């Protein structure tokens, strides 16, 4: 993917996803009790994306700190606001790549540089980001002019969606924010998508109805199915200390997150639809098997024809508190296997 180079109008980084550098730990303040969903217990069921992309209008604003960070102070080659807009578009493109792939959801930027504030002393944001952003968007754009809103900020790692499931909900849809220092812990050039996915993608996931999937700190909603910190977008990879599976999240949603989000968007009527070509198929899981406790096993699936077009991931859906202290093959509840980045390999060895 592509990311603008700070202070360089004509240069961009182009690179693939990697885990070689790191940034400071992220803390998500989203409270699941602030949800606008009818709570449903965890259950496994077939999820089939339809043959339409659903587009939602997103308004993105920024603090003066964010705009100043990405601006080079040279108006002869574009204003700081235009520099910040390039960074905003880069982040949104990365988020869209995952949302379109996993969810058939596209986010369309409908705000312009007028909402990318240049001066931290005069911008409308003074620390109460959720309420301040909601007021700003409703005043500048109007409630009917956007489906969800998000604020980008420069500072210590932080984030909050303001809710779980509030896209298109008046007085709630414009309260998400993500804050990042745009550095890595080794002091090198910031050159990764951690802000895009660990922060923005995570909080927008909440706005679309996704709950946390980690299990190091149990949440009573039935979705604590990734051991420890977890590793997908709605988990907490890299910020749970001894329970961390890895430093940062992988660029995909867990089954639970996909189900949460698709259930939510089916419950609302906003957004526009664009038809796409897709191929639906049925998968037969075959008969159930009982194996002795503690036995290694292999999950196998006959690849679908045109194998190159599909990737596969095996995920466990049991929900319970699982930490580094109690993780193991003898638990009666909770995750005994982590989620692994989807690949073209259709089988999975447990443990691996």
Question: What kind of region is each of these model predictions?
Answer:
Residues 11-167:
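Fold-level signature of zinc-dependent metallopeptidase catalytic domains
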Residues 78-90, 191-195, 199, 252-255:
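Soluble non-cytosolic domains of exported or imported proteins
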Residues 108, 313-352:
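Exoplasmic/lumenal beta-rich domain surfaces
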Residues 110-131, 170-252:
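The catalytic-center signature of Zn2+-dependent metalloproteases
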Residues 264-282:
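Proline/serine/threonine-rich low-complexity linkers at boundaries of modular beta-sandwich domains
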Residues 278-287, 325:
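Proline-centered linker/hinge motifs at extracellular inter-domain junctions
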Residues 285, 289-299:
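Short, solvent-exposed loop/linker segments at the N-terminal edge
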Residues 300-307, 317:
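Acidic, Ser/Thr
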């Amino acid at each position: 993917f592509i990311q603008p180079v700070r202070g360089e109008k004509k240069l961009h980084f182009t690179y693939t996803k990697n885990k070689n550098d790191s940034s400071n730990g992220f803390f998500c303040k989203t409270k699941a009790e602030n949800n606008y969903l009818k709570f449903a217990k965890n259950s496994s069921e077939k999820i089939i994306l339809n043959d339409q992309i659903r587009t939602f209008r997103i308004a993105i604003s920024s603090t003066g700190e964010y705009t100043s960070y990405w601006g080079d102070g040279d108006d002869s080659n574009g204003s700081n606001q235009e520099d910040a807009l390039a960074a905003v578009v880069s982040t949104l493109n990365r988020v869209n790549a995952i949302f379109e792939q996993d969810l058939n959801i596209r986010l369309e930027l409908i705000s312009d540089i007028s909402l990318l504030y240049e001066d931290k002393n005069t911008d409308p944001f003074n620390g109460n980001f959720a309420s301040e952003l909601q007021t700003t968007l409703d005043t500048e754009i109007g409630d009917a002019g956007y489906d969800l809103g998000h604020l980008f900020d420069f500072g210590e790692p932080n984030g909050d969606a303001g809710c779980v499931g509030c896209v298109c909900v008046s007085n709630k849809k414009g309260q998400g924010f993500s804050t990042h220092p745009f550095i890595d812990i080794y002091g090198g050039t910031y050159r990764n998508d951690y802000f895009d996915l660990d922060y923005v993608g995570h909080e927008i996931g909440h706005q679309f109805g996704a709950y946390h999937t980690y299990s190091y700190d149990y949440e009573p909603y039935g979705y604590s199915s990734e051991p420890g910190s977890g590793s997908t977008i709605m988990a907490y990879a890299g910020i749970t200390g001894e329970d961390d599976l890895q430093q940062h999240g992988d660029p995909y949603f867990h089954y639970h997150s996909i189900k949460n989000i698709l259930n939510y968007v089916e419950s609302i009527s906003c957004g526009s639809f664009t038809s796409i070509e897709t191929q639906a198929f049925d998968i037969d899981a075959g008969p159930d098997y009982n194996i002795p406790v503690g036995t290694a096993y292999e999950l196998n699936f006959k690849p679908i024809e045109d194998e190159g077009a599909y990737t596969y991931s095996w995920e466990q859906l049991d929900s319970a508190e699982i930490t580094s202290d109690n993780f193991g093959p003898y638990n009666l509840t909770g995750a005994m296997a982590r989620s692994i980045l989807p690949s073209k390999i259709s089988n999975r060895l447990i443990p691996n």
